[in-house]
């Protein structure tokens, strides 16, 4: 069985929920404290043993490439000024993995974005990590899925429970047999109408996929939002080849919408010993 050494991170979206901030800056570069959100995703992949990452980009995304590139002039300035802690952080971001880029020329959905990276992946199993979800866990979320793949040899989709009131916002699984945290899946449903979801187990932006998925994406018709939906292709593949779901362990932070982004920033700040006490004091002073 081939080991998983490659990952795709889709980052071509327009980030309309964060306009006007994202008019000229990629949504993925919005910072949680002192790191852009996409770095948290790359760090997760790196911790899981992923060696090669392809980031699917689009227009106005050059800042992502610059962030993960070497900046020798900046490093020289930091070294000359004795700012070793900042120098270490800057160098760390460039050494996480081998990072490559491909452009998604048209915004045609997540499935289309994944298919854009087919040539890079070749005939290998691979990981997909979406940038809207930061996951904090002792074992990286994507590594938990990799472990299930090594047990089964089949694709594995990361899920977590959500309130029934929001199931219409997610891809949802219709589970069959359960073994520990792993599910066999009867059906994958992309954003079911409110009140019709077969469960409250939602797909949460982490996937291990076998290369067969590209054949299904190649022929996938447009679905929700008139886009090529990855969930629809996974559902078709599941009819022919088993696809498992795994309820991964970890705290998920939704940074794909403004309130979740603010909550994440506050929680991360409260974890920072340099900020915690002053932030708590400030919040108390607000009097809420």
UniProtKB/Swiss-Prot annotation:
CDD domains: UGPase_prokaryotic (cd02541). SUPFAM superfamilies: Nucleotide-diphospho-sugar transferases. PANTHER family: UTP--GLUCOSE-1-PHOSPHATE URIDYLYLTRANSFERASE. It is an enzyme of class 2 (transferase). It catalyses: alpha-D-glucose 1-phosphate + UTP + H(+) = UDP-alpha-D-glucose + diphosphate. InterPro entries: GalU_uridylyltTrfase_bac/arc, NTP_transferase_dom, Nucleotide-diphossugar_trans. This is UTP--glucose-1-phosphate uridylyltransferase. Pathway: Glycolipid metabolism; diglucosyl-diacylglycerol biosynthesis. Keywords: Carbohydrate metabolism, Nucleotidyltransferase, Transferase. The gene is gtaB. It comes from the Bacteria. It holds the Pfam family NTP_transferase. Belongs to the UDPGP type 2 family. GO terms for biological process: enterobacterial common antigen biosynthetic process; UDP-alpha-D-glucose metabolic process. Catalyzes the formation of UDP-glucose from glucose-1-phosphate and UTP. This is an intermediate step in the biosynthesis of diglucosyl-diacylglycerol (Glc2-DAG), i.e. a glycolipid found in the membrane, which is also used as a membrane anchor for lipoteichoic acid (LTA). The lineage of its organism: Bacteria, Bacillati, Bacillota, Bacilli, Bacillales.
